[in-house]
Amino acid sequence: MATYTTSDFKPGLKFMQDGEPCVIVENEFVKPGKGQAFTRTRIRKLISGKVLDVNFKSGTSVEAADVMDLNLTYSYKDDAFWYFMHPETFEQYSADAKAVGDAEKWLLDQADCVVTLWNGAPITVTPPNFVELEIVDTDPGLKGDTAGTGGKPATLSTGAVVKVPLFVQIGEVIRVDTRSGEYVSRVK
């Protein structure tokens, strides 16, 4: 199995920590005036989703995680699982609710997603960065009502709720950033 040393650390690097695959979110090399240099990292455990701050002594090696990121197409959902298909081999993968997590509210039929596999099973599903969804419910925006925050909640076709500007109406299609859950623009 491949290993990485602290000099290889960079955001996005996947390795094993306590028997669980992790990804480095951010890292910083620290050389104190007195004592040994170390690398300060913030890692996210891929299975549990926990974010931890971990320090590694300079030169420490860690085992590479045997995970694969695949570009898969979302097919359908049944009672307990979401199904994704590889666009070239047509192989199907089923992901449970824990693996899908918050991505559920951004999944559209035939959407291209990045699915992270560990030991052949999906552990995380990442939806596209931007999705276009129709507004199915929102309060009507009254003309001249600009006092306050200038936004209102809107329910989208997938059930997600986002804050939108007052001029957006029911039936319009909007673009949403799935990473932050924020309104980006109207789609013409």
UniProtKB/Swiss-Prot annotation:
Entry's Gene Ontology cellular component terms: cytoplasm
Compartment annotation: Cytoplasm
BP terms from Gene Ontology: peptide biosynthetic process
GO molecular function: translation elongation factor activity
Domain of life: Bacteria
Main location: cytoplasm
Function: Involved in peptide bond synthesis. Alleviates ribosome stalling that occurs when 3 or more consecutive Pro residues or the sequence PPG is present in a protein, possibly by augmenting the peptidyl transferase activity of the ribosome. Modification of Lys-34 is required for alleviation.
Name of this protein: Elongation factor P
